[in-house]
Amino acid sequence: MLEKYSKESLTLIVALHELLGHGTGKLFQVNDKGEKNWDTEAVKNPFTGEEITTFYGAQETWSQKFGKLHSGYEECRADSVALHLIQFERPFEIFCPDQRENWDDIYYTCWLEMIY
């Protein structure tokens, strides 16, 4: 299965990992004036429903906060996004439209590729 669907599974995983895994996300931050870069009325903590209380200060960066772990943490986030999104048909419709009858096998191969 890894050999048969390697091209399709790698296309899916790499596209979702790179385009949406790395290409999405919001760094909550305040500027030098203390203004937040998100709508505080609309965006809430997804676990509590309360206002967001932790965020980056002005001039703070991702790598400053996480040090040497920042790149590994970002790769794990991108992989998680890719693995979540392959649960849905839309990526298969976009990247493997002519393989509909093989989508289950390609899906399974995606998981194998991630752990192989």
Place the predicted regions along the sequence by residue.
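Long, well-structured alpha-helical subdomains associated
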Residues: 62-76, 80-116
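Secondary-structure transition/capping motifs at alpha-helix termini
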Residues: 23-34, 88-97
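Catalytic glutamate of the conserved HExxH
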Residues: 14, 18-23, 80
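Short pre-active-site segment immediately N-terminal to the catalytic Zn-binding motif
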Residues: 1-14
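Post-HEXXH active-site segment of zinc metalloproteases
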Residues: 25-74
